Amino acid sequence: MIYYIAHWDWILLQSRSEIVRSLSDKFQFVGITPLEKNRNQLTDYDEILNWKINRQRLIDIRGLIDLRNKVKNLKKTDTIHIFTLKTLILFLISTLLLKKQTYTIASITGLGYLFSKTRIAQILRIIIRPVIKRSINKNIDVLIFQNELNKEIFIEYSKFKNRIEIIEGSGLNTNKLKIKSTFNKKTKVIFVGRLLKEKGIFEYLKIAKSFSDSDDIEFYVAGDIDGGNKSSINNKELEVLKQQVMYLGNIDIPNELFKYDLLINPSHHEGFSRVLLEGAYVGLYCIANDIAGTRNIIKNLDCGFVVENNNVEKYVELIKKRQQVIDNLDSNKVRNKIIQNYSVEAISNRFKIIYNKSW
């Protein structure tokens, strides 16, 4: 049995459900996650166990105890696969004094808020580090990263010495994505993601403001506030946002992303940007902040440009020159590369090799 653990049910739905479905003929999967908005969509798992944790709290003691109780009686033949750095930290704390029973894998899909530049994050890193260094080598057999920079930073921080893998992406179901056939006469620019400061939402609004007098371009935001993340904008900031751009809320990406022309990803940090892969596959021109989790996508797929230091003026310059890039996009070539390297099938095959070695 393979146990997928995540501190948010959306994580076990997004990409991981597709992986579970792809490997269901080889393995059985149980999800351990707090059941929230996505509880009725987690149908690909053989079973879902409700992890009773309040993810809006920094440390929820009851949640740590509940996770401990769920994993302490697992069998030696079972495998645990943890998703996200936050879940890994919660797992390490909750299992501090437990005897290790299972083969345990952790996917760090991005370093997130903990490795941001905020003062609170810096303090948290200092406080949590002794716990991580003490238990990570004892309790984790394999760490999976999505880019080299995240690997280097976290290995130095944690002193992890066991097996390390680089797997770029979480698996894209390319069969669901509607393909773009033509570009709009009035260019539609879109930001897709949670409305977090760390995702670059404020930089995006500055970019949009630079085109406030232009009648040949429109700016959209698709996503929502995340109350469980300290980087999230608040309701007051959301109301201001609605006055500056066209706010869509959450959209059905597979069926709606193709309606737009240009995807902006000004995120401060990414593991391996899923929305960039989706935008590139659909056929959008993509511009992103030059970070480890976006650079390789843009470079390998040749689907747009990266911007150093999230420079708003450079974004504006590239957007103004958009037509010459759009005219030269080879979306068929992009799609073939994504299928080969970043699809659900490609990532499932990598996971399958790791799972087979755990049995």
Briefly describe each language-model feature range:
Residues 300-313, 321-327:
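Conserved acidic donor-binding segment of nucleotide-sugar-dependent glycosyltransferases
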Residues 285-288:
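Short hydrophobic beta-strand element within catalytic cores of glycosyltransferases
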Residues 32-37, 192, 218-233:
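Glycosyltransferase donor-sugar binding loop
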Residues 13-18, 187, 191-210:
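A conserved mid-protein helix/loop that constitutes part of the nucleotide-sugar donor-binding site
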Residues 82-90, 108-109:
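Short His-centered aromatic/hydrophobic patch
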Residues 232-250:
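Nucleotide-activated donor-binding/catalytic signature segment of Leloir-type glycosyltransferases, i.e.
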Residues 49-50, 133-178:
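Donor nucleotide-sugar binding/catalytic pocket of nucleotide-sugar-dependent glycosyltransferases
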Residues 268:
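Aromatic "clamp/platform" in nucleotide-sugar-dependent glycosyltransferases that forms part
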